[in-house]
Amino acid sequence: MKYVIGIDLGTSAVKTILVNQNGKVCAETSKRYPLIQEKAGYSEQNPEDWVQQTIEALAELVSISNVQAKDIDGISYSGQMHGLVLLDQDRQVLRNAILWNDTRTTPQCIRMTEKFGDHLLDITKNRVLEGFTLPKMLWVKEHEPELFKKTAVFLLPKDYVRFRMTGVIHTEYSDAAGTLLLHITRKEWSNDICNQIGISADICPPLVESHDCVGSLLPHVAAKTGLLEKTKVYAGGADNACGAIGAGILSSGKTLCSIGTSGVILSYEEEKERDFKGKVHFFNHGKKDSFYTMGVTLAAGYSLDWFKRTFAPNESFEQLLQGVEAIPIGANGLLYTPYLVGERTPHADSSIRGSLIGMDGAHNRKHFLRAIMEGITFSLHESIELFREAGKSVHTVVSIGGGAKNDTWLQMQADIFNTRVIKLENEQGPAMGAAMLAAFGSGWFESLEECAEQFIREAAAFYPKAQNVQKYKTLFDLYKNIYTHTKDLNTALKSFRKN
């Protein structure tokens, strides 16, 4: 039996999985690393922590699996998007990495929007947001100019770890798409953008496909991990692209619903010219010459977490949600908007805050929970609605994360999205997508689709119920009015909020 390893470099920890040719996860490990937050809005990490914890996780994985190193054909990576790693000409790190959730770059974003207008949208198919890589680069250029002058190349987080394990520098299209420097449809760095902002295109790393073999392990890395030097290393992909691969989102009509702290609706896209006018993200997929569109709900699972911490800190989520299935659709006239930390899709608005509309004395805790679950799902449905309005088919939704752990919620998704919703048997997220890229790159399969047939198994399917679909359609129309009617109120309340 042969094996591959998938590595997922997350924001708080690195996860590794060992997968055999049947798609079975034979071992997994995880190692945490700290977040560095020196000021409000700052979010950084030391890239060295990623490297050391990844090597430790791999060493433990090999040790506990009892698999011989010669039977491990390849390794690939998934990683948190947008993070900025700057290297000098000696390939040494110049400063801590600035992460995707760092918000210091608002002034740079405003100036970029004023400078480029919709021209940036024509090239990158995305609007400027603080999370993207280019605004971080501009911040360093403005605030740490002497340091920035030493920059020979920039990398994304997973690409830096791969560089340290192989000695070669690359990035691939799915991660490059999140920099605001890539011409998405031409699949090349944009000299136009680089020239206009005064950054040399020479600092952009070489581009490869996600399944390309980029090298093998350095001797000291092989020695520390227990792997062989000849173990092939494949480029990998951005976490969302790998999450899509790991859930089988590889053909038109298939969409991913992922509910973690935030919520993501991600849909496969073949047509590179489809225009969403920046209302949703549009990125290169980990599957060659394919794309995906993505909408984000900032406080999806976070809404339930907030409710639990505030009103039921000693209960598990399973206990918390008991009895929700008995509450009728609409929670006895209660609607919730999940804007606890602002919103991303379809309203890019950092000032908006959440609402519970329709409260009365007859509502109890279960009504609030039902309303929160429905409100999160309505918010996610706004992204699906944008996809459908642009002519996309959404005939199957694969649900992963917190939203897939409760059958009532899965049925709710089927009814609100008005489509079939699939629960997976063995959900591994982006790490599985990375392993699949290694399996495909190693020649186990002719295509990622063939790999998905072998690796991904459905546990259950939920279908929309006509009477529920109609009720939710009425409620969804009411839900969409809440943003408009509370926007000015929340802006006026902003000065009263604790910073």
UniProtKB/Swiss-Prot annotation:
Keyword Phosphoprotein in record? no
Record CDD domains: ASKHA_NBD_FGGY_EcXK-like
Q: Is Transferase included in the keywords of this UniProt record?
A: yes
Instruction: Quote the Pfam families the UniProt record gives.
Output: FGGY_C, FGGY_N
Signal sequence annotation: none
Keywords, comma-separated and alphabetical: ATP-binding, Carbohydrate metabolism, Kinase, Nucleotide-binding, Transferase, Xylose metabolism
Question: Which top EC class applies here?
Answer: transferase
Its UniProt entry gives the catalysed reaction(s) as:
D-xylulose + ATP = D-xylulose 5-phosphate + ADP + H(+)
| UniProt site positions, description: Important for activity | D8
Gene3D superfamilies noted in UniProt:
3.30.420.40
Q: In the UniProt entry, which residues are flagged as the active site?
A: D239
* Functional description taken from the UniProt entry: Catalyzes the phosphorylation of D-xylulose to D-xylulose 5-phosphate.
Record's PANTHER family?
SUGAR KINASE (PTHR43095), XYLULOSE KINASE (PTHR43095:SF5)
Q: What is this protein called?
A: Xylulose kinase
Q: Which organism is it from?
A: Bacillus subtilis (strain 168)
